[in-house]
Amino acid sequence: MRSLLPLSLSLSLLLVAPALAATNPGDDAEKAGEDAFEDAKNWTVQIRTSVNRPFTQDQTGSFQGAGMVVDARRGWVLTNKHVASSSYSSVTVTFHGGGPLPAQRLYVDPHLDLAVLAYDPSAAGRTPKEPELDCDASPPIGHPVGAFGHPWGFRFTGTRGITSAITSRLGPEMLQTDAPINSGNSGGPLISLVTGRVVGINTASMAKDRTEGISFAVPMPYACAIVDLLKKGEDPSPPAGLVDFAIDENEEPTLVVARSRLPAGAIDLRTGDELLALRSPDRALENQSDLMHALRGKLDDVTLSVRRDGAEVTLHGNWPAASRVIERQGLWISGALIAESEPMIRGQVQGSPSLMIHYVQDGSAAQAQDLQEYDLVLTANGRPVDSLASLQTLARESETSKSEMSLMLLRLGSVRNGLFVYQTRTLPLVDVEVVGPPKAPEMETAAQAVVSGPELSSQPGG
């Protein structure tokens, strides 16, 4: 009888094993992931963008990325800023099984790597599903997620991973994941493989030659706030970047004010102030992204608690909104794109030069005269220029008289010749064109493509 006992146990295990396999939680998780990726095909799009005259931080050329429908009735697609471009561009969106549809930029965020595109829903030939968005909180560390998009042109492809951290090390707060995010994934959804909800917008990954499995996504609560304000017809712009904050020993940005360049009449922040909380409604502030998020749509009436000289004080006032990216204008002169200087440069140089060279076209007259990106424009034909309108007036005068235009530039120098150096250049005027919309578009419409000819307003977008 003893010899039969092992046999009976073996038979019992054989009979039980199939039942265990059928109820294995891993199988349920696998199925949930498969369903999430299959569902994502219904509301994820491929985006193609072409840029001819880029502002700084953009590039010339054609690019592709991903996006997802966030309002099927209006034809709104959420994606990355670097996919939609901060420059005037040609954009198309393509659904799974469909052809390319023209799209326009509705909103481009100056703080987060986010943008909203708009296409004509009647031209799509379908009413796409909308994804479920996790707008309340980011998932915990270790949560299974999937990145969906078009990596290296492999369309509508999913990859798996987990959430690794929430980090502000790169500036804006980001959701860190080891799910592979490659070229073509940018702007696509990062999906919870447990709930099927979108938890982030795929944005970037660390260089593969230096690290493995470190990618980043914009947390969904920040993206939801922008979309919700747009749906209400309100401006979701964050506060203008006129306050410089200190960085701590861990290279993490803090909420300690290093310098305030807010105008007179705005909220009275001073060097050394530590921002603690937003009041009305009460909300503790943890980092700069938290501050930007909390102030969207509330910039006209800001109440902050700050620690000043060891005591907590309450400040009240307004905070100017960041300039709307889609309203930005530039002046194309002989192969150089000149526009307002970037916020990180504006106010850092004595005299605060307001105009900067954003792009120099290869082979152009501007390149031949050694104009360079980030050159600050001080004078034209010996006269100060403090706006695009004044620069355009002087350029038109030179063009009419068929004479060259002389420029005084301020350029980053070196140890040998000083931090900044002054350069003079004489530029033949091959062509003078306005880049951007002649007037500010409504929030429901996107910026126009490159426009030639109209006069610039005295208050160009920046």
Regions found by a protein language model. Give the residues of each.
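Flexible, gly/ser-rich surface segments that form the specificity/activation loops bordering the active-site cleft
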Residues: A32, R126-E173, A207-I214, I226-E234, ...
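C-terminal subregion of chymotrypsin/trypsin-like serine protease catalytic domains
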Residues: F37, L193, R197-P238, N417, ...
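C-terminal recognition in membrane/secretory proteostasis and scaffolding
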Residues: R105, A118, K231, D235-G462
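Active-site-proximal beta-strands of protease catalytic cores
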Residues: T44-Q46, V77-N80, S138-P151, P189-D209, ...
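Active-site region of chymotrypsin-like
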Residues: W43-S50, Q57-T60, D120-E132, R155-F216, ...
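A conserved glycine-rich beta-strand in the N-terminal activation segment of trypsin-fold
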Residues: D28-E34, P54-R74, G99-P102, G187, ...
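Conserved active-site neighborhood of the chymotrypsin/trypsin-like protease fold
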Residues: N52-R53, D71-G149, G153-F156, G171-M174, ...
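N-terminal activation segment of mature serine protease catalytic domains
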Residues: A21-M68, N80, I226-D248, G461
